[in-house]
Amino acid sequence: MIIFSMITGSILLYGQEIHSALQLRNNHLWRGIEVASGLVYTGDIHLDYKNFYVGFWAGGTANGDYKEFNNYIGYKNKHLTLELWDIYNFSPNATYNNKEFFNYNAKETGRFMDFRSYYTISDRIPLMLSWNTVISGRDRNKENIHNKYSTFVFAEYLVYKKDDLEVRGRLGYSFALNNPGEQSNFFSKKAGFNEISLMISKPLTIGSYKIPLGLWGMWNPVDNRALLQFSAQVYSF
């Protein structure tokens, strides 16, 4: 009750800083991986205070094959964003521990902690550079002795912008900081360029209502596959 009262009090005090969004997609793409396919919904809610924020992110499929619930905290200013995500994918067919939400034991947990950083050069040079590392959790070596610290770095550039149409390109590379004797990392079967993406976004206007639409083509040379995503944002505030 005390924790609930604190959360409720924070919401009442900083209600104007609460933000949320919900998207529908034909799949869930992430760092060269197709996490889920089918009718996918993803949404989040977060509380902002000055340059800091804390929130929850969830995703799932209509048939229940994919289920995910994450917590995150972050800091942002004009150019830099830093985040720490606590990620738990508890899909029914998972090959890891998907039944103990609060188990953080490194050798047993089904979750992982993901450190994320993004830096945008400037408004004139809309180039984003990003470094992301799995710092704990189910990113283990074959013997389950140590973490691999799998890392994904990428550069993203705003290629074209006219009115409300945007086209972005992204090049991503994955590797592990600690995987002696092994090739694979959390994101691909070996180190290499595992994401080449082209992303197009434009809102669809229906009366006074705008529905942001997205088209995302993603190629993964390392794992020899290509994927396409369509998305629509149902609401945001």
Short names for language-model regions:
Residues M1-H19, F237:
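Cleavable N-terminal export/targeting peptides
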Residues Q16-D48:
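Outer-membrane beta-barrel initiation region
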Residues H19-R25, D44-H46, Y53-G59, G74, ...:
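Transmembrane beta-strands of outer-membrane beta-barrel proteins
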Residues G32-S37, Y66-N70, A94-F101, D139-I145, ...:
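Outer-membrane beta-barrel translocator domains and adjoining extracellular loop/strand segments
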Residues S37-Y41, D48, D65-F69, K76, ...:
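Residues that define the transmembrane beta-barrel architecture of outer-membrane proteins
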Residues G38-L84, V159-E166, A176:
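Glycine- and aromatic-enriched membrane insertion/assembly motifs of diderm outer-membrane
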Residues N71-Y72, T81-R111:
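Glycine/small-residue-rich loop that forms an oxyanion/phosphate-binding "nest" at active or ligand-binding sites
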Residues S122-G214, M218-D223, S231-F237:
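Outer-membrane beta-barrel transmembrane domain signature
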